[in-house]
Amino acid sequence: MKVKEIMSTNVISIAPYAKIIDAIGVMLSNNIRRLLVEGGMIVTIRDLVYAWDKLNNSVSTVATRNLLFIDPEADVIESAKVMTSKGVGSLLVGDGIKVLGIVTERDVIKALRVGKDIMAKDIMNADPLTCVKDESLSEVVELMKERWTRHAIVVEDGSVIGIISVRDIARALAAKRDLRKTKVDEFMSVKVIYARPDDTLEKVREMMATNNIGVVPIVDPAKGLVGSIGERDMLAAIVVNSF
C-alpha cells in the first residue's frame, strides 16, 4: 500500500501572525489536528493547547520549522518508520517543496494490521497520566506538558470514568473558558473504549481505527486501570510487527 492511497489532501495553511486562539478555531471547524504555517512551519493542536495562557500570541511562536516530507509512492510502512524514528505524528506528502497531502499516525493505524500474537499488556504504557473529574483544565494541561502527552484518563474510586484530550481542552478555549476555573468533567469524553491486558494488539488497533480515537485505556477486571496504549505506542508496534 502506498502513502498516496491513505493520505489526506485536506491540508490547510494559516498565516504566521495569526493568533493561537484563531488557529484553534480553524482546527476545530475543519476537524483537523495540524496546520501548515506559511513560511515553512507546522503547528499541532497540542502545540496550541500547551500555550493556553498565551492565546493572543502569534502561531509562529509555537510552530515547528522542521518540515518532514515523504514521497507519495513510498510504502505506508516506510512512513510509519520515519514517524517513529523522528518522534513525530505526521509527515507532509510531496517532493520537499510542493505539498500534495499529509499522512498521520492515525492514517497508518487505520491502514496496517499488526501481528495477532502480541497482547495489549506487551506494549502498553504501565504509567498513564490520570486525573480526577474536579481538577481544573489548567492543572491537567500542565501535567500533559510534563509528560508530553495528549490525553489524561479520568479516574474515580479506581474506575475509569472518562478521557480528557487536548482537543477537548481546545474546545474549552474556543468557548472562551478560563481553564483555571473549568473542571475536567465539563469537557471530558464519557464514552470510554477500553481493552483488557490479554486482548490482542490487533483488537486494540481495530478499536482505535473504528472509533477514531487516540488512546485506549487498559483495564484489568480485578485491578482496574493498569495501562494505556496511545497512537505512538501502536505505531511503534506496527513498525516491528505489521504484516
Set out the residue ranges of the language-model regions.
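Tandem CBS (Cystathionine beta-synthase) repeat/Bateman regulatory domains
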Residues: 1-243
